[in-house]
Amino acid sequence: MHQKIIAIILSLMITSALFAQESSEKTMRRLTIGTDILPLIGGLPFGFVGLLHNDGKNEINASAFYFNDDDENISALGFYPAYRFYPKGKGKGKFFEGGVGAGFINWNYGQEKVSSITFWPTVNLGYRWSWNFGLSIAPFIGGNYGIGKVEASDGTIKTFKEDDGSESEITGSLNPSIGIEIGYMF
């Protein structure tokens, strides 16, 4: 009787130890959740989620941000879907990114509340480092072009004062796209 119990316990211990062994093949982390630290430094809440597919050669990204400037009487909610290409795969190394952002802008112009939608076609070049414990850092640089206007019913277009005293519109020009994404990969 004792031999049967010992044999059962021993076989359970051996099989549980066998199934607990790690596979030599590591599964690739596919989901990334994070933020871009440059907008955060400027006080803008910003977050993104990315999903790797095709053995990490491609990534679908979706970003969102919120902006509010009481001095300028303007606020915005933005979404930026993008697609990344990693030439070497595995979701690491050099990447090329293309996307189109949409900004839903509200401007309080006197007694009028102006609402507008702007679009921002963007291209970026970057590099992603990722570690086995999940941390991911991806600096990037590129450019975007703003399409659309934030215009009141009397024809006044929302502008921002620059440091040199000049004024510029929100859209209608080529702008730099710079960032440092920090995320965790699952």
Locations of regions flagged by a protein language model:
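Cleavable N-terminal export/targeting peptides
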Residues: 1-28
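Transmembrane beta-barrel architecture of outer-membrane proteins
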Residues: 30-32, 43-45, 76-80, 118-122, ...
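Structural signature of outer-membrane beta-barrel domains
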Residues: 40-42, 67-69, 101-105, 144-150
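Gram-negative (and chloroplast) outer-membrane scaffold detector with strong preference
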Residues: 50-139, 184
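Outer-membrane beta-barrel and related beta-rich outer-membrane complex signature
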Residues: 110, 151-153
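Outer-membrane beta-barrel "beta-signal"
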Residues: 172-186
